[in-house]
């Protein structure tokens, strides 16, 4: 029977992939500093460098929070163990090819005297790995030798047990992913490790104690996770937990012992849960039921420690987590629910342990506590967000939203906003593009969540469902970035510095790299890892008028020993797992920006064009270029030699100063006089604390000297313009940033760029026309009321005082949101004029299509932005055929009322529907439940806009009839 199940494949896919700035926690352990794919040896998504901000994979971004709770591993690792330099062996490293050449005796002797990470391609599937692991005799030799060493290890010598277990874990990891090794993925084969595990456990030195003993205990748990367990192996493990509990005050600050008991709990839980899913059995039908009470009781002791400290909080959380999951194997099957309910009442409301308990009751016990009371996770999560993130700030007409803790100052938020503008300006200059590659994605609105502290950031796991063993995390699927405020004692980096890095990742996803993170060929095999991380470190050095400069803090990460520095080849092919590559990837891109801009530009052009083949070839050629590597090394030495001359860019106080009023007309006049532009256009934007402007136009330069020289000339010119503006009387010019895009050469052989300026707007007293939103187009039936909406119409410097609708059939209305009935079929032009309190008017037009008979959906309507607008009491026909998997509809509810939604599945295909309210596009307001061929639900609707997704989940084709009443 296969050890891993279908659901575990999902669990593997939701492992977080690190994509972002360095955080400020303990150094990554030796175990973590390995090629990133090695960290997925457990299909549970927990083993990754804690110092990296994560950017999660496709599955985690797609699954709902509730689904992630069910399939993901939400246990919490203890703090990382400080890295210790490995003892140098006879040979620095070995490959699987080297191991294949050895006879059995040579193999076991070698494995016994090296560290597992000296095997360079362990956990990587290649022909050598396949040959090695398909040799059943060799596998048995390793298992037998592990048993021998397990029975003979001492408190001072672990006999290389960790290396043997890692080689076996690599076998099962590769077998899970590759059918060529499928025999190793059978539990019957993995059970062959049980005698070795028992030999280890029967050794009197199998206990927590010295570092060697702790290493063996950890290896025991990890091997169970990837191989298998039985009753006896679990019973032996209970002795380890009891020893830890009995010596809790002594052991709680010992990271190796913490890691060891975590590996024991996680490994056994993972194996047993996997068995349930694969065998399709209930807990009371398994060998463990009623026979591992001792192990579970020790976990329960951890769950109910009562006194939570920063040092033991991770342990308490894990105790609650595993007590819930394993409680059903206790001789008292309600024990898990009893313990988790006790924990919920024991720990402070809305604390981390409290949330873990609530989640487990929701996930494993249908939302009912031990007394039968309903536990409403959604309501509690909402309370948590209100407590930990009570403040909201909006900028740029709502396109940037900050949600923060109450201790994150308003000044800090303003500085971060202006820092984003400096980074954005330099970023667009370099890539030459400022148009979203895929407009309509969630990142049309960037949401930035900032907790008060690293401690409160841990609640992000409970409030939003994402990993917190990082310095922050950007979820491209939702356009949301999570991080926390920090003190100088907690970090050598400021929040602004880290924010600049992460904001660059947002820009990359929106303007540079096609598709969502992790999807598509360009993301495969970590092609972009070196580029995206180094790129973010590079642009964190953006300035207003001095281009992009190296940061002193990142230079400090380069080795003082030239022999220890990365080569260009190693940098270009760097992968997650080592922290150093961030620094060297920055240095390479800084070098290219400064000395080989054409090369830098070509790399980005290939990425933006999604040209995987030529990107691979170009990267390969660069990696073999000795001149590039030589100059790269010299550039790094130059940075190190001049490190004290650099600083860390941060926004100036000028951004926060009070600036005198000045009309935007006058601003535009002065700016276009300083930099002559054709077709200049001034636009005002609204933010919570202030308004801003963008001034766009086309600049024509001198006769072209080639794109690279033209770019340098333009960058110099724009910087000079910014400096000239800053010398003028109005201080607001010191907030202006600028970029230029869309390079071309005109018919006169002169280069041209589109230039965009951004700065503070202080045009107080100048009346602006209102914004009108007609919310069309509309559809309806003859002699049935059609609801027209003016939602979104606004006047930023006053209020709208009148509305005038012209329905195109000779009739009008002055209502804000009128209902109109058409007498004849046809297409009508509808106009809406709004007037503000100072007399200015704005007009917008749309169409309404009126049909005699039933309505039919209009494609495309696959996304919320394309949704077909329907009214209440509407029936509409639709189809899901071929690649058309989803139809989206939208309707408005003016006041609270009960709504019936029904979809008639006319062909019996696999389909359903879900409904979201505009205020929460992540969680369902309602969802369809099958009733024969109807998929229906009734719910009480609050006022607002709703989005209804009708979708199929198989390959069937069919039509349906949707009714909303």
UniProtKB/Swiss-Prot annotation:
Residues 1-30 form the signal peptide. It is an enzyme of class 3 (hydrolase). One of its GO terms (biological process) is proteolysis. The keyword Signal applies. GO terms for molecular function: metalloendopeptidase activity; zinc ion binding. Residues 94-765 are annotated as: S1 metalloprotease domain. Zn(2+) binds at residues 501, 505, 533. This is Collagenase ColQ1. It comes from Bacillus cereus (strain Q1). The gene is colQ1.
